[in-house]
């Protein structure tokens, strides 16, 4: 039984195994209707719980479709239904769910909730997102880079904006997949030192550059994310926009990167805030391939978790 809690907690060879599996499964589905089962149906007879304390579109749809394509069934549970940690303990919830399902995916706010779920579950647990990390997204991003440009090892990845949970998982991936990483954003939104330190300990070049044009110079991949959350009050939104406006990914900034550089955004996006529509719909952008690859990467993760 394998939990998938964070990229840095998984062996590099096993990450490579998952990545190769994701590429193979995507290729095998070429031309097939979306609702058609995979030929081998590895999840036939299996039940997967999808827990959403924090709501999502891409995570819910991609996991649900992925389980069904592999022949399994899903049970989707919202935060209101679960009341995690309010009443029944997370530990007891994990033990009970383990009697009903074969695999648990949880998208939650606090990392502690994920870790407690994994500690007490007797079935594999997948991190669908926490406020600290988002490993499933980064597996999809690495997959997307590989299918467009080949190995990501030795490449320069630049993150522009807020050093959030997706940025943190990129730093974990830098250490595991062997690419260099530059962050450009305001000092108040730097990624946590723990994540920067991990990548550096793995021998990767990690830099923080306040000038976005200098940061993006020679980049192979430029990545950004939303500046605000749907839950942020208006005052916080205005403050963050003022902080982050200099780090918008626009055509002028992308012109500083390599001519064949890619642009990624995990979506949903606030168009013409963190990135302009000209970039999102332009020749560097692979954002919709990136979104699709959530499906294939997560299918590979589920197979690995179950030893299939």
From Swiss-Prot:
GO terms for cellular component: cytoplasm. Carbamoyl phosphate binds at residues 56-59, 83, 107, 134-137, 266-267, 294. Its main location: cytoplasm. L-ornithine binds at residues 165, 225, 229-230. It catalyses: carbamoyl phosphate + L-ornithine = L-citrulline + phosphate + H(+). It holds the Pfam family OTCace_N. NCBIfam families: orni_carb_tr, PRK00779.1. PROSITE patterns: CARBAMOYLTRANSFERASE. This is Ornithine carbamoyltransferase. The gene is arcB. Keywords: Arginine metabolism, Cytoplasm, Transferase. Belongs to the aspartate/ornithine carbamoyltransferase superfamily. OTCase family. Pathway: Amino-acid degradation; L-arginine degradation via ADI pathway; carbamoyl phosphate from L-arginine: step 2/2. Its EC number is 2.1.3.3. It is an enzyme of class 2 (transferase). Reversibly catalyzes the transfer of the carbamoyl group from carbamoyl phosphate (CP) to the N(epsilon) atom of ornithine (ORN) to produce L-citrulline. GO terms for biological process: arginine biosynthetic process via ornithine; arginine catabolic process to ornithine; citrulline biosynthetic process. It is found in: Cytoplasm. PANTHER family: ORNITHINE CARBAMOYLTRANSFERASE, MITOCHONDRIAL (PTHR45753), ORNITHINE TRANSCARBAMYLASE, MITOCHONDRIAL (PTHR45753:SF3). It comes from Cereibacter sphaeroides (strain KD131 / KCTC 12085).
